[in-house]
Amino acid sequence: KGMSEDYIKNSCIPEMFVGADFTPADGWLMGLGAHMISLKPRTSTEWKEQTFKVNERMTAFSYEAHLKYSGRNYTFAAKTLMASALDHTALLGGYGVSSVDSRTGEQGYTPFRHSTTWVNFAYGTKWRPGVFVGYTKNLGTGKSLVSADKVYGMGLDIDQLITVSLNVSYNLPHWKFGFEYCPATAYYGTTDLESGRIEQTHAITNHRILGLMMYYF
């Protein structure tokens, strides 16, 4: 039935994240984290003109590492993420049907795995230019898929995504003015059912221009 909070309500297992940050020296911040989500997409199914109660569950784990260094007038930050089914956080991801019980219609699921890495650098105080570069790669699924139509999530027909952001801000007491240009290229294709990876891709590029004016109280 599409996006719904019922999947995690039916699961009765809360979404969990455990992380730790470290400050090994002045200006440095490093950290690690692990995430778990467990969903029950359905509790019953209509199959061969009958209604069956089913016990379906999709559980996925994600892991991340990040670091940041803040100098006197510059900042560098980076993060890498091995994500599974984190589409509810606006990342590419989701899951697909990996098996169907021929007797009851009960389905098994497999999450898509995506690797995402980004770096960001900004320099200056009053005038502060910055650059952001991000890359996401679809690593497929752990099990084969039943059908390319039985996948659920966001951007599951994208093999890789490359994003660059060039930005500059002008900072005053209580005021901030900014400008950003952000091209993003996504490689769309068809899903290989055996691996969950995307093949026969073609690139589409989107260009975004953003202006900002902010007043701080």
Describe the predicted segments one by one.
Residues 12-14, 22, 34, 38, ...:
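A subset of solvent-exposed loop/turn segments in beta-rich extracellular surface proteins, enriched
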Residues 1-22, 90-107:
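Surface-exposed coil loops of outer-membrane beta-barrel proteins
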Residues 142-145, 178-179, 187-201:
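A glycine-biased, small/acidic residue-tolerant capping/turn segment at secondary-structure junctions
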Residues 172, 203-217:
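Outer-membrane beta-barrel "beta-signal"
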Residues 26-158:
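Detector for outer-membrane/organellar transmembrane beta-barrel domains
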Residues 7-8, 55, 201:
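Alpha-helix capping and helix-loop boundary segments enriched in small/acidic/polar residues
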Residues 167-189:
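C-terminal closing repeat unit and adjoining cap/tail of repeat-based domains
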Residues 14-18, 61-65, 115-119, 162-166, ...:
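Hydrophobic, lipid-facing positions within transmembrane beta-strands of outer-membrane proteins
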